[in-house]
Amino acid sequence: MKKERAGNVSAKRSPKLSTTATLRAHARHKIEKGAVTEGYTADRTKVVKMLNDALATEIVCMLRYKRHYFMATGVHAEAVAAEFLEHANQEVEHADAIAKRIVQLGGEPDFSPDTLVKRSHAEYVPGKSLMDMVKEDLIAERIAIDSYKEMITAIGDDDSTTRRMIEWILAVEEEHADDLAGLLDAGH
């Protein structure tokens, strides 16, 4: 009796795999949808909106980092400015990945300057001193970290490609926060 139950449990865990013919037929059906197949279960409209807000966040963060890169002055400014530039370039990579995913989902990436700050989770705060700049960037990274964690939870298993992309971005944002916290601790 126990063997029978064990067999049933493992059978329940194993998803039924489609035949090659079925996979091929599904791929040909609604081909105009591109990467979005019948197995996609997320609400695309909501995911695209979340991604456009994340896109705005990445662009605003890039702009702030670029300003801080050019405005950094003081004894340790060169090393801190290099960190700002590295982060700015990584934010551009994130924005590009997000925009590409939006298009894959059949949406349009919103690069409108008129609404960037309004849609961004993080604020654009210029900062006056080098220490202010580091603090503002750290605050923005902490906001991004929380918003990406919420997005990952909201998406769940409904869109694994988008979730993995956001998890990758989240890992980089956490590195940014660690870098900036280290600069604060060092008193730059």
Named regions from a protein language model:
Residues 1-188:
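Iron-associated oxidoreductase/ferritin-like identity signal
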